[in-house]
């Protein structure tokens, strides 16, 4: 996110060119970041899975394999539900978490309050949330 402050892609931490799945959340790289937009298009050509989470239709939607349109203001609840699934189903890199994170057990406890079925106020169905 540091590139959002400096405006320079050189400080960003994303690695779109090597990603198998790219998550674009509430952002329009077509207008906001031409370099990131080009990387997103390369990822698409490579066959990467592109998921857009945004209530607005942006150019990225036309290149996405999945477009989620949550009710505005509910994106944090959606993120918590997604983390709930990842942690509950152990779909994360345990070694990475052990070595590089702090507070993971607290996060795991917190997301228990956000099972996907409990965040219907996002206006997304349970099957849609689970597809991500």
Predicted segments, located by residue:
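Conserved small/polar residues in nucleotide/adenosyl-binding loops
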Residues: 122-128
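N-terminal export/assembly segments and adjacent metallocofactor-ligating motifs
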Residues: 1-91, 107
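N-terminal leader/propeptide and maturation segments of large enzyme subunits in energy/redox metabolism
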Residues: 92-121
């Amino acid at each position: 996110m540091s590139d959002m402050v400096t405006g320079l892609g050189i400080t960003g931490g994303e690695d779109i060119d090597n990603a198998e799945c790219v998550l674009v959340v509430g952002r329009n790289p077509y207008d906001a970041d031409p370099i990131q937009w080009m990387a997103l298009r390369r990822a698409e050509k490579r066959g990467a899975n592109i998921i857009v989470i945004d209530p607005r239709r942006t150019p990225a939607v036309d290149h996405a394999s999945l477009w989620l349109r949550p009710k505005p203001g509910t994106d944090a609840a959606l993120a918590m539900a997604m983390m709930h699934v990842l942690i509950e189903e152990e779909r994360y890199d345990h070694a990475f978490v052990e070595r590089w994170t702090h507070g993971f057990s607290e996060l795991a406890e917190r997301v228990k309050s956000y099972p996907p079925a409990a965040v219907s106020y996002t206006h997304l169905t349970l099957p849609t949330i689970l597809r991500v």
